[in-house]
């Protein structure tokens, strides 16, 4: 292996001496960071510094690689002005220390693909294109700046030097980084802890929630990048001798640094030049120099993320290979853009700016729309959703509607001059209908019943059985009577005792009988009725007997036939209706009186023959002879006396007419019918006539 020729070291720039220490940068608070983000970054960087303290044991005299020296363009010594002297040799001792610090902080290894870089002039002069980097920028100096939704986290960019020490001790620093895996894990745990704190502090705000998501994604990318840096450093430590002798790789590194430096739109930190021994200035948080808007770095952040992912994948696949092969694959994976793409970069930046502005405008308008939607509209301007259905007319609305119609019609007629006679309506008296069910104590409607309950139900005269048991729930509204003391107790009336005793609500007083209530009394009342009827008949018979007693006997034969007919009709009607007995007539048992009637008929005929021996029986009927007038008068005189004496016995004769047939056989002038067929009827009629005319006298 060929030993590289030493290269004179470059002079230290003035910016290195003027650069503030890391502790001063961390102590100052950035204006563009909120409190939570600033505290998180401060803890993160302080923890990394404590884990990896700086090393002062380094070789004072270090030599650079001739291939790296040849890769540096003329006049472009890392931002140094032309004519500056190279840095002294005693400064090269800090190179190993700076390399370890940068790897611990997440920067790239000396031969790793650099991050985005930009010139400080891009922040100073806003008119120039931030994506264009001047050619005077050092090819190995790369500064990575990542922005996370308003919280800018600055990743310290590790300066790469094209000069390498030919000594084996110089490359031992890269091999010594293999033990930094544990430090990387601790840093990852610290980042996870900081992420959890950020989640707790920023979960309350919706805008900060978006920032939190982007921050977590970028922090995970940062951790992956740091692990890739460690692996790249390890691989470089293994094959460091081969890289020092490869001039072509050095030239590719030069081209890569120049191309990527021209395409980056993010401003880098204050660039420090190489020390005499090749040491680098420690990275610092830029705040005063970086003043870029979030819109200017939108496209660059996307490109950085893509490049870092591709670089990490390639390193994971080829980590067993040589460092030169790894570097070549990275060079092929990362697109290179030179100065000729300035116009294209400007166009991309302008497109990114326009997209960001459009996104912001959309966000603002969306917030305004939300505010406008959340504010309630007044009632008169409220939106009507869907078709409104017509409400059903109630009684009140119908009455109100008809009233308004009548008012409008009346006003219209008044305007037209139409007059209408006002007639008082005829009010018919409303007929009160009594509830039929309430009268019988069965109405279940209560107050809802449409019929009247203003009456006393018929069941009020009956005792309430439920009240007697103590289970009536209707109270005063009960249709039955609750005054049970009016009604006698059945047990006490029938058995003479009551089981309930004094607790019985019915009356235990026996009512006094005003009249006979036994069946014998009823029979006596029934017998008294016909007795009264018989007394009335007797009085009427006495009246009729007094009337007929003053008439002469000669007037009787004139109306004999008519009287017989009337009596025959009366007897027939009496037989048909035996219940109703006319006054003055008493019917006799004719069946028993048949033999008596024949005897009586014979007596009558014999007396007539004796009285009229000379003439026929009908010659002198109704004409008394003058010679015999005295005889008739005497005969009537003799008969009148016994009739008056026997008035007391007339009742007995009426009751038992058949007992004394001789008294009833009085001489009469009744004519006997000639026909034999009517003999029986005539005999009965004559007997009835005698009873009717002369029975009271006997």
Swiss-Prot record:
Residues 281-300 have a biased composition (Acidic residues). It comes from the Eukaryota. The keyword Zinc-finger applies. GO terms for molecular function: DNA binding; RNA binding; zinc ion binding. Residues 535-548, 665-680 have a biased composition (Polar residues). Residues 12-21, 65-74 have a biased composition (Low complexity). InterPro entries: Su(sable)-like (IPR045124), Znf_CCCH (IPR000571), Znf_CCCH_sf (IPR036855). One of its GO terms (biological process) is negative regulation of DNA-templated transcription. One of its GO terms (cellular component) is nucleus. A zinc finger (C3H1-type) spans 429-456, 458-485, 486-511. Residues 1-11 have a biased composition (Pro residues). The keyword Signal does not apply. Residues 1-23, 56-95, 109-137, 272-300, 512-553, 607-682 are annotated as: Disordered. Keywords: DNA-binding, Metal-binding, Repeat, Zinc, Zinc-finger. This is Zinc finger CCCH domain-containing protein 7. It comes from Oryza sativa subsp. japonica (Rice). The lineage of its organism: Eukaryota, Viridiplantae, Streptophyta, Embryophyta, Tracheophyta.
